[in-house]
Amino acid sequence: MSEILDGKVQTKNTKTDEEEAKAKEKHERSSVKASTQVDYFLNESFVKDCFQQQNLLSKLNLSDFKILGCEINPLKIRKNKSVIEFKLQFASKKRKKQQQEQQQPLSKIIVGKWRPDGRGKEIFDLLQEVWHKGFDMEGADDHDNDDEDEHYHLKLYEPIAYFPDCNFMLTSKASGIQLKDMLVQKQVEEKEIETHIMQAASWLAKLHSISLLPGGVYYYSMKEEEEKLNKWSEHLSIHPDFGKQIQSMLSCILKIKRSLNSKCFVLIHNGFHPGNIFVDGSDLTVIDFDHSCISDPAIDLGYFIAKLVHSKREYNLSLNVESLEKRFLEKYASAARMSITTTKETLERVDLYKARSYIRHLHSKYYKQLHSKSNDNKPNPVDFEYWVKKAEECLNRWMKPACMCIMALYTVCDSFGIMPDTSLFS
């Protein structure tokens, strides 16, 4: 384990062999239990019985129906998270068998998500509260102006049920096509893409405006953020050309984030990118609240824009991302229910999180290659430099002069192998 201290990576004592052995044994036991829980939901008979016994049909407003069949489609099966799609077929309890055979059976697709860490119930409760405070679509046919019409097209996947004994959550399946696929497949006019990106800005403003009951939502943890950025710094620091620069940028990002006033924090999605957004006609639905928490709203804005920049480069898109970013932020600002000052300060922090996202991309894409012993499996030098420069540009636009001086000081001192004195900037 390591941490960034004055711009350098400091190594802590590792666990003893005995501690590691106990941790491994505990993990293996939990993995066996977890595997068993997930396996249950891959069995059609179990699923049908479970859903009937858990009164699922009443939650789907199908109390007068029974489950005829269940088609199971595992989307992702992992030790830390599994996602399974269920296509259920129903028949009316009141109709005779002959009538049921003649009529096309009613079907519905729902999605189950399992995770072993116990946060599933917390996520489900959060989804329910958010759903009832702005996304339940009740009265959707009663709107009589353009603003309300836009509001009702901004949707959330519906929380249906949670089974605490199995750590299993059921939600509706988002309809339509992923915004990411619309970007990558290049089969949609750019004007339509731009329309949905503006919708995404309105969706974020809608989410960020929701006031939640106290005590029920996970708050952003500075400790977890420090651990994450420390890990990135340690892993990327071995790059011969940009290791020191990345360390300095991450150190500066941490310093800035520590100084933020939590009074500006709101409910954020914390994973808002085109892969979690589905478009169906004029409807836009967002999924995956697994990392949602109370934190800086600029996180969602910066991450979404950074993902657009990444998609443009990765898939050679013709989108004018700079223009889209400007319009995206303007749309968010016009829809946000914040004071003018708070909105302005939020938008000013977007570059901070774009820089963080670019470094996150470097870590995700090149960490294993950096540590590979094979000379044939090293990072693409042009691409690596591109993302370092993008992060640097964002920080240079945003950072206060004092922070820029700190970065320069770190770089100079590192070249001489000495520790910088940053007390003058505190």
What are these regions (language model features)?
Residues 241-244, 315-320, 341-344, 357-426:
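ATP/Mg2+ or Mg2+-diphosphate-binding catalytic cores
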Residues 2-20, 24-72:
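Juxta-kinase regulatory segment immediately upstream of eukaryotic protein kinase catalytic domains
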Residues 89-97, 103-215:
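ATP-binding pocket architecture of kinase catalytic cores
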Residues 49-64, 212-269, 391:
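An alpha-helical support segment within catalytic cores of ATP-dependent transferases
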Residues 338-351:
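Acidic, serine/threonine- and proline-rich low-complexity regulatory regions
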Residues 131-138, 204, 208-212, 257, ...:
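A general structural signal marking secondary-structure boundaries and capping sites
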Residues 73-97, 105-106, 167, 254-299, ...:
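Active-site acidic catalytic loop and adjacent metal/ATP-binding pocket
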Residues 298-337, 354-374:
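Active-site activation/catalytic loop segments of kinase-like enzymes and analogous catalytic loops
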